[in-house]
Swiss-Prot record:
Ranges for domain Globin: 153-291
PROSITE patterns hit by this protein: GLOBIN
Protein name: Uncharacterized protein B0361.4
Region Disordered: start-end pairs: 32-65, 99-152
Top-rank lineage group of the source organism: Eukaryota
Membrane-crossing residue ranges in chain numbering: none
Annotated InterPro entries: Globin, Globin-like_sf, Globin/Proto, Mb-like_M
Molecular function GO labels: heme binding; oxygen binding
Family annotation (CDD domains): Mb-like
Length: 325
């Protein structure tokens, strides 16, 4: 094959299959077609096992050009494809998929779109701003009083949540608290059954006034706790009807449940935490006032003459025994 003077000049190839036989014949003995030798061709690279997958080059897709732009570009044949891409990129697509906004230029408002926010997040932002304004107001009025001068029953953020919730409250919430407490404890039902409607209404009104005072003066803890102690002292007079100090717990739970129902803006867990902190402080004062009144009643239950007589008798006994010795 490498010799040019060789007589094997005619090569016949049948196909490109790997098993095809290449026949070389003599040119002088073409009519006999006797093959001198046969040789199998090598496998092509494409038919061997692929070692790696060669991906075709990616073509960049050019976006369609509006008819108006095509008419403008057809007059100038020297414009390149890159300039067409830049001209197309200067137009924006509308969000609804219509083609009318392709011809409208870009504006600052299109890039400055605000995402829709939930009512809860917007309310939290308003609460944070209100807290900042309240803190600035406290700093101006309180001066250098420190943290204790501006401290209240609950933190500032919870105080604002409570005040916003209680705007929807009605005076009938006191009666609802009493009914809920009676439904949860049999002892409470027994005590209320021994009272007339006017007395029960008076208890509900006192509870509503206490909550209203606590909400309005949440930053004045001493004033609110004084009111709570006075209310707790009135419950000491209900002991003959079967009232016990452990019934303050169902009263507090009923008050929290009724006040949480008033809110529909904040998260339920946040509202529950805020009201729980407030009523925990309130009923601490109510319980303290109850025990103060009970102790006072026990001290004053015996007549003064009986107390002095007992003291004199005890003193005489001790003096006689000491004299005998």
């Amino acid at each position: 094959m490498g010799n040019e003077n060789s007589s094997l000049v005619k090569i016949r190839r049948g196909s490109k299959e790997p098993n095809v036989i290449i026949e070389c014949v003599d040119s002088k003995k073409d009519h006999l077609s006797t093959p001198v030798y046969r040789k199998k061709s090598r496998r092509s690279v494409s038919q061997s096992r692929p070692t790696s997958i060669i991906e075709p080059p990616k073509r960049s897709i050019v976006p369609p050009i509006p008819a108006l732009i095509k008419g403008q570009l057809s007059g100038d044949d020297s414009i390149s494809i890159g300039s067409r891409k830049s001209s197309v990129s200067n137009f924006r697509l509308s969000s609804d998929g219509s083609g009318d906004s392709l011809l409208s230029p870009l504006t600052a408002s299109s890039n400055d779109r605000r995402r829709s926010r939930s009512l809860c997040s917007a309310q939290m932002k308003d609460d944070a701003q209100a807290v900042a304004a309240q803190q600035n107001k406290d700093d101006k009025t309180g001066g250098s009083g420190g943290r204790k001068a501006s401290s209240g029953l609950v933190p500032s953020l919870n105080r604002l949540r409570i005040q916003q919730c209680f705007k929807a409250a009605k005076p009938s919430i006191g009666d609802a608290i009493m009914k809920r407490a009676a439904a949860s404890r049999a002892e409470m039902r027994t005590m209320l059954s021994k009272m007339n409607e006017k007395q029960i209404e008076c208890l509900g009104k006192q509870m509503f006034e206490l909550i209203t005072d606590a909400v309005e003066n949440a930053d004045k803890s001493e004033k609110v706790l004084t009111h709570a102690r006075q209310l707790g002292g009135t419950y000491a007079s209900l002991c003959p009807l079967g009232f016990r100090p452990d019934l303050f717990a169902p009263l507090a739970d009923a008050a929290i449940a009724e006040c949480v129902k008033l809110d529909g803006v904040h998260k339920r867990c946040e509202t529950l935490s805020a009201w729980s902190q407030l009523f925990s402080a309130l009923f601490t004062g109510v319980r303290d006032g109850y025990y103060q009144r009970v102790r006072h009643q026990r001290r004053t239950s015996l007549p003064q003459n009986t107390i002095t007589k007992q003291l004199s008798v005890d003193f005489s006994k001790t003096s006689d025994t000491s004299f005998v010795r």
